[in-house]
């Protein structure tokens, strides 16, 4: 990364290894007022308490924020006028949350701050705890109960569902989950190396997968229940550079400095290439047969056009809050409509 600073030591610009430039502008209080990525600006406004009051993106869509006297976020107003609201008690705990897209949810707490009940519409779920604050019972809206039991270290060792089915859990000395036993007698188990990496998993049917790691705890091989081995090698940045399957077929991968996949080459030499915009958005995929898929975006990164080859394309449109409203292709147009709460209705 290359950084440029002003006389106050604030970052003015940042250039990543791919050449993407992010520039910063500040207000009189030293707060970031503008962030520009390759010419696309996002604006920030603040209230008197230095809370973010509004964010306007490169498509001129503004989201506004409001807070109570304690600095708790109480309201988010979206570009279409819909809003999320949140109410708090004197201790700053959420007691009522009303999203723009659904029913309000109310919360009740005990003296220790544990949630005692969650109410959404007419549905109430209740919770009970032991003296250590661990959940021991959940009573669902239909009155059914799920109970929980713990060992002295606080590990969950038992769970009983509303039908009375018991699931038991056991652990290693390091409190790593070692075995799960179900009500029907079936079980799953795990084994670990000294570093805590899973080296074996046995499922309820008795099938065991084994895992191998290198000195820096990167997975280097997976051996399935039939003995088939898949091996992994990594580059200097810990990206998977090579995968060798059980038939010794090798697939190789390369990446740019930001970790974006650049090429994928299979055992037959067929190569798929990937290219990205300066912002890191996928710009094109070139397949082994020469077919090129391209992607176009708006200033905020919403996908506008997918050119899928043979002159065919898929175009997408969005509303003022970034939800897709229309997808068009040679096969026709799909229109998406939302209700007042933001739910997709058609």
Residue ranges and their predicted role:
Residues 1-16, 20-57, 61-78, 82-99, ...:
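Beta-strand elements of repeat-based all-beta scaffolds
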């Amino acid at each position: 990364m290359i950084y440029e600073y002003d006389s106050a030591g604030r970052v003015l610009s940042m250039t990543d290894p791919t050449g993407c430039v992010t520039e910063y502008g500040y207000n009189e209080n030293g707060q970031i007022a503008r962030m520009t990525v390759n010419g696309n600006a996002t604006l920030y406004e603040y209230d008197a308490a230095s809370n973010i009051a509004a964010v306007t993106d490169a498509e001129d869509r503004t989201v506004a924020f409001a807070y109570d006297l304690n600095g708790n976020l109480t309201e988010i107003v979206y570009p279409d006028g819909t809003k999320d609201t949140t109410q708090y008690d004197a201790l700053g705990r959420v007691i009522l949350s009303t999203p723009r897209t659904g029913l309000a949810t109310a919360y009740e707490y005990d003296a220790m701050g544990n949630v005692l009940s969650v109410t959404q519409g007419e549905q109430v779920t209740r919770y009970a705890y032991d003296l250590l604050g661990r959940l021991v019972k959940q009573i669902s809206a239909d009155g059914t109960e799920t109970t929980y039991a713990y060992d002295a270290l606080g590990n969950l060792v038992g769970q009983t569902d509303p039908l009375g089915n018991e699931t038991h859990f056991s652990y290693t000395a390091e409190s790593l989950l070692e075995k799960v036993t179900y009500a029907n007698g079936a079980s799953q188990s795990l084994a670990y190396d000294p570093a805590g990496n899973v080296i074996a998993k046995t499922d309820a049917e008795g099938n065991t997968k084994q895992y191998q790691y290198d000195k820096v705890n990167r997975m280097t091989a997976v051996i399935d229940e039939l003995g088939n081995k898949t091996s992994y090698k990594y580059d200097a940045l810990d990206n998977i550079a090579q995968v060798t399957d059980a038939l010794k077929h090798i697939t190789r991968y390369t990446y740019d400095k930001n970790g974006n996949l650049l090429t994928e080459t299979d055992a037959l030499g067929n190569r798929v290439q990937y290219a990205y915009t300066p912002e890191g958005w996928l710009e094109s995929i070139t397949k082994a047969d020469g077919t090129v898929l391209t992607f176009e975006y708006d200033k905020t990164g919403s996908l506008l056009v997918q050119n899928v080859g043979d002159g065919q394309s898929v175009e997408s449109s969005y509303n003022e809050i970034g939800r897709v409203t229309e997808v068009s292709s040679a096969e026709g147009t799909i229109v998406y409509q939302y209700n007042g709460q933001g739910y997709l209705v058609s």
